[in-house]
Amino acid sequence: MNKIRPIHLRRSWLFVGAATENHIDEANESSADVCIQEFEDFCVPERREFARKIMPEVIATWKKRGKVAAVRINPLEDPDGIKDLRAAISANVDTVLLPKANYPYQIDKLINCVTELEKEFGKEINSTEIVPNIEQAIGLENALSILEKKQRVVASLVASEDMSVSLKSPRNKTSKILNY
């Protein structure tokens, strides 16, 4: 693995729009431990190609500033997912975040793709971390199986608002559902 901040010391994770240059510039100056170039929710499809083009510079800058450089790709079921992943591995990203991680086979597919791309780009095998994003009730139900992919999966994020919607939880100012 790369010599990056250990997972248990990553206190702040900053998601920025993959093609939103002013937010990327602000991330450069932030104190975030992990900066994430976000392709799925924060980047409209028309801007993804541009975002992939600037990715090598974004990743290099974050690394130079001592940040864990991460990319949240589109799901691999989306045609842009593999394009995002290819760009991320070629840019020497530290960590790949996979949205909508609902089933172990999705992680298996991602691991296989990452390994093949590491070989293709001459990157050390198993050097790219994977962080599944569990956003739906079915992903929560399958979380243990998803997280057992130990050679690559270093952590998981739960998208609290998406999860709340998936669970059909009532949301209001006094709601405590996201406390658990």
Q: Which residues does each PLM region occupy?
A:
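Expand to "…catalyze enediolate/carbanion chemistry for C-C bond making/breaking, isomerization
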Residues: 1-180
